[in-house]
């Protein structure tokens, strides 16, 4: 039994890697073939890796720990926010601020400032202040919300981090590694898998591909918290082999 099917991966375009001239040799084991100058990712391995990541994230959630969803590239921003919110988790989808994890105490002070400004807006304080000052405070509040809104209720460091594109989010990964926080990530053919604890080989540039994988990680959290089996799909060996061939033919 697998939590994701080859058909789902194919339909979302998870198998399309980067151009062959833009690759990391460490990803060779996850590459099935090359077609028209583009690497095709081995989806049989992706199915297995999604399983591994899913059960790990589910275990984290069962233990009462949180998962931080991170994806600041345009293709990932909406999915990261939507799936984190759906599963009651935290997210960073605009910009990774240095020290978000390693200097969490200082970040918490900025979050407290955001809460303070929200309270001022709600309790009517803004109404009695000069318009110029209110305008300045609202801009400050908007900037804080944009960068910290996804973690404003995070009281402690997460138990794991789910990342889209380790190359772009390298600072986030380095902070997580420094603190011993396990990293699950969608890793495309141009990335270094050695920096990730749970590699999910796949296309990190297609919105549908990112949405599919992020949704599975959110499902894992929900299942871990609720004890519900949300998504199990039987995958037969023959079917996997057949669909892998379809992926190659589709790329031609």
From Swiss-Prot:
Cellular component, GO, one term: cytosolic small ribosomal subunit
SUPFAM superfamilies per the record? Answer: Ribosomal protein S2 (SSF52313)
Pfam families for the chain = Ribosomal_S2 (PF00318)
* Keywords, in A-Z order: Ribonucleoprotein, Ribosomal protein
Annotated InterPro entries: Ribosomal_uS2 (IPR001865), Ribosomal_uS2_bac/mit/plastid (IPR005706), Ribosomal_uS2_CS (IPR018130), Ribosomal_uS2_flav_dom_sf (IPR023591)
Domain of life of the organism encoding this protein: Bacteria
Query: What GO terms describe the biological role, i.e. biological process, of this protein?
Result: translation
User: Could you tell me one molecular function GO term of this UniProt entry?
Assistant: structural constituent of ribosome
The UniProt similarity line reads:
Belongs to the universal ribosomal protein uS2 family.
Q: Which HAMAP family match?
A: Ribosomal_uS2_B (MF_00291_B)
Name of protein: Small ribosomal subunit protein uS2
Organism expressing this protein natively? Ruminiclostridium cellulolyticum (strain ATCC 35319 / DSM 5812 / JCM 6584 / H10)
